[in-house]
UniProtKB/Swiss-Prot annotation:
Plays a role as an intracellular lectin in the early secretory pathway. Interacts with N-acetyl-D-galactosamine and high-mannose type glycans and may also bind to O-linked glycans. Involved in the transport and sorting of glycoproteins carrying high mannose-type glycans. It is found in: Golgi apparatus membrane. This is Vesicular integral-membrane protein VIP36. Residues 348-358 are cytoplasmic. Keywords: Calcium, Disulfide bond, Glycoprotein, Golgi apparatus, Lectin, Membrane, Metal-binding, Protein transport, Signal, Transmembrane, Transmembrane helix, Transport. GO terms for cellular component: cell surface; endoplasmic reticulum-Golgi intermediate compartment; extracellular space; Golgi membrane; plasma membrane. It is a single-pass type I membrane protein. Glycans are attached at residue 185. The keyword Disulfide bond applies. Ca(2+) binds at residues 164, 166, 168, 195. Residues 47-324 are lumenal. The keyword Transmembrane helix applies. Residues 1-46 form the signal peptide. The lineage of its organism: Eukaryota, Metazoa, Chordata, Craniata, Vertebrata.
């Protein structure tokens, strides 16, 4: 198990990510080292490769050289709003006020397990806290629907990863830029005034703006586990940002990216999107499920992430969710039962004591 864990960490740092990032600099294991690993840990490596092998899905990927430069569309992808295609990047918004742009994949994705690598850049002339608003990455039922959430629609169905660069809530203790995750079945609204805290599942601070080197984000969804990692330090190493279990996402949704600016602005660029299929063994019962009928959601005993920032990570001042109401009612009922039992015992003893005086 120790060898397997070490090889897994090695895979995250170098081997597994390299197929999706062939141009990144940085040292890696030499062929001799890799050969020794295969000889010493052959069974472990074989199990990992067979269980989680990766395959680039070009029909869901955006890779240079782009086709359709200078036009408003390209094969497999549709543009909207201020989006502009150049030979080096797809610019969702320029560094100008009141702009919205998005890019959406033509093809619905029917993969149950996948990993997406996004090469992006957010930059502009604005100084600290005088820029905005950020990029959203989507896996949703609807596409090409403009709206107030980073250039796309609110009350969406599916998954959103927000790369937020501006703190709208002046009372927040968070450090921006900030990456957060939201899963929605259409019933939740993203609250910009609170930077989405009411509906956020998890998040992390990530200093990705105005970097003088490449910045990357990885999103992995496999067997209900959603993981978000970043590579922002030009070290060719993934750093953990978000890790959530119990996430339910259907198949047949669309991948996309959008951005928006308001009174403050930035350039929001997508350089590449690469989607990999993860081959994962499943039981016959899992294979028999109609994954297109699954409703987006998360198995949570607590409300989504802190609605009021708490350095300890505890939930404070959150809304009364169904579980909270149930637990409160259960505690109240137990309290009533305990009081009733204690009262009955005390009453009975008093009655017995009174009988002795007659």
């Amino acid at each position: 198990m120790a060898a397997e864990a070490w090889l897994w960490r090695w895979g995250w740092g170098w081997g597994q990510r390299c197929p999706g990032r062939p141009g990144l600099p940085g040292p890696g294991p030499s062929p001799t080292t890799f050969l020794h690993l295969l000889l010493l840990l052959g069974p472990v490596a074989a199990d990992i490769t067979d269980g989680n092998s990766e395959h680039l899905k070009r029909e869901h990927s955006l890779i240079k050289p782009y086709q359709g430069v200078g036009s408003s569309s390209m094969p497999l992808w549709d543009f909207q709003g201020s989006t502009m295609l150049t030979s080096q990047y797809v610019r969702l918004t320029p560094d100008e006020r009141s702009k919205e742009g998005s890019i959406w994949n033509h093809q619905p994705c029917f993969l149950k397990d996948w990993e997406m690598h996004v090469h992006f850049k957010v930059h502009g002339t604005g100084k600290k806290n005088l820029h905005g608003d950020g990029i959203a990455l989507w896996y949703t039922r609807d596409r090409l629907v403009p709206g107030p959430v980073f250039g796309s629609k609110d009350n969406f169905h599916g998954l959103a990863i927000f790369l937020d660069t501006y703190p709208n809530d002046e009372t927040t203790e968070r450090v921006f830029p900030y990456i957060s995750v939201m899963v929605n079945n259409g019933s939740l609204s993203y609250d910009h005034s609170k930077d989405g805290r009411w509906s956020e599942l998890a998040g992390c601070t990530a200093d990705f703006r105005n970097r003088d080197h490449d910045t990357f984000l990885a999103v992995r969804y496999s067997r209900g586990r959603l993981t978000v990692m970043t590579d922002l330090e030009d070290k060719n190493e993934w750093k953990n940002c978000i890790d959530i279990t119990g996430v339910r996402l259907p198949t047949g949704y669309y991948f996309g990216a959008s951005a928006g600016t308001g009174d403050l602005s930035d350039n929001h660029d997508i350089i590449s999107i690469k989607l990999f299929q993860l081959t994962v063994e499943r039981t016959p019962e899992e294979e028999s499920i109609d994954w297109t009928k699954i409703e987006p959601g998360v198995n949570f005993l607590k409300s989504p992430k802190d609605n009021v920032d708490d350095p300890t990570g505890n939930f404070r001042n959150g809304p009364l969710t169904g579980w909270r109401v149930f637990l409160l009612l259960l505690c109240a009922l137990l309290g009533v039962v305990v009081c009733a039992v204690v009262g009955a015992v005390v009453f009975q003893k008093r009655q017995e004591r009174n009988k002795r005086f007659y």
